[in-house]
């Protein structure tokens, strides 16, 4: 019997992969849920003192982190680019809306490939990521109902 450390074995139990193991989050790592609501302010959510009852959002806020100091433009694409990258929307190329390329490096209408996004950083650390809804961060010619879903439509 050989002393191989990787490679095929007689059975699956005896085989070991020759590739690096996929990263996994540390034990006890938190779940990360980001909720983006258009046209919503502090005065609309119960967890920020509103008279409007929002029990499910209040419950999420009570058990997690609440960010209370986020400043950006009122346009959807730049706001989402800031949220996903943690950087100013000008510095990641999303000065206006997606699909509006002015030719200037800070206004290409897409998030720069050099700007890491929260989902990318989480994936590198073993998290599974999922996004749903209208993000408005990709050029229409880069989007298709067939995907690719590992980066569509965020970049």
Across the structure, where does each feature detected by a protein language model lie?
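Formylglycine-dependent sulfatase
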Residues: 1-155
């Amino acid at each position: 019997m050989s002393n191989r450390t990787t490679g095929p074995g007689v059975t699956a139990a005896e085989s070991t992969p020759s590739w690096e193991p996929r990263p996994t989050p540390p034990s006890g790592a938190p779940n990360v849920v980001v909720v983006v609501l258009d046209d919503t302010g502090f005065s609309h959510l119960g967890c920020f003192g509103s008279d409007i009852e929002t029990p499910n959002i209040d419950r999420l806020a009570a058990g997690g982190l609440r960010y209370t100091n986020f400043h950006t433009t009122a346009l959807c694409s730049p706001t989402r680019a800031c949220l996903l990258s943690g950087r100013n929307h000008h510095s990641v190329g999303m000065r206006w809306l997606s699909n509006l390329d002015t030719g200037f490096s800070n206004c290409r209408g897409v998030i720069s490939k050099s700007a890491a996004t929260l989902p990318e950083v989480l994936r590198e650390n073993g998290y599974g990521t999922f996004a749903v809804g209208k993000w408005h961060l990709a050029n229409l010619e880069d989007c298709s109902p067939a995907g690719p879903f590992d980066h569509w439509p965020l970049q």
